[in-house]
Curated annotation (Swiss-Prot):
PANTHER family: MITOCHONDRIAL RIBOSOME RECYCLING FACTOR PSEUDO 1, RIBOSOME RECYCLING FACTOR. This is Ribosome-recycling factor. Its main location: cytoplasm. GO terms for molecular function: ribosomal large subunit binding. It comes from Rickettsia rickettsii (strain Sheila Smith). The lineage of its organism: Bacteria, Pseudomonadati, Pseudomonadota, Alphaproteobacteria, Rickettsiales.
């Protein structure tokens, strides 16, 4: 593995860790309606479990409501059941093939729990970043041991790996701070 490939590989892994964090945070409920809340909902359809997005269209007509337009009328009760089982704290209101999900306001206690959870996700991501850094540094040690790179170059590349880790760590901090503000906004 050459130096450029190593750096690119580390950057891709760190970017992937950041994307995972982003995906986890989208699942955290804020006061605003978001179709991402329903990503975890599966529906018993045609003899198998399917994601909700494959049996209905999802929209947010306003900041406090999610609309689920079920395509097949026979699936409405199955979709309602899937939403209830997902335990998201949402109560479906059905009107024909349209299911409305009013988003209740979050209590202060629940907001605090969500902020703690967001911080936990952030810390888990930082642990992933540090593991990626460690793996990169081990590759550098091996390259130096095999006389592929000199000691000075090893030191320089280690500093670059550390800078990359610091950059991504600060990105994690800003993403978490932004999510915290989103959750705490009433």
């Amino acid at each position: 593995m050459d130096k450029e490939h190593l750096k690119k590989n580390l950057q891709e892994k760190m970017e992937k860790a950041l994307k995972v964090l982003d995906h986890e945070l989208k699942g955290l409920r804020t006061s605003r309606a978001s179709v991402n809340l329903l990503d975890s909902v599966t529906v018993e359809a045609y003899g198998s479990k399917m994601p909700l997005s494959q049996v209905a269209s999802l929209s947010t007509p306003d900041a406090r409501t999610i609309n689920v337009q079920v395509w097949d009328k026979s699936m409405v009760s199955s979709v309602e059941k899937g939403i209830t089982i997902a335990n998201l704290g949402l109560t479906p209101a059905t009107d024909g093939q349209l299911i409305r999900l009013p988003i209740p306001a979050l209590t202060e206690e629940r907001r605090t729990e969500l902020v703690k959870l967001a911080h936990k996700y952030g810390e888990d991501t930082k642990i992933s970043l540090r593991n990626i850094r460690r793996d990169g540094n081990e590759v550098l040690k091996k390259l130096e041991k095999d006389n592929v790179i000199a000691k000075d170059e090893h030191h320089s590349l280690s500093e670059q790996v550390q800078k990359l880790t610091d950059d991504y760590s600060s990105k994690v901090d800003s993403v978490i701070k932004q999510k915290e503000q989103e959750i705490m906004t009433v």
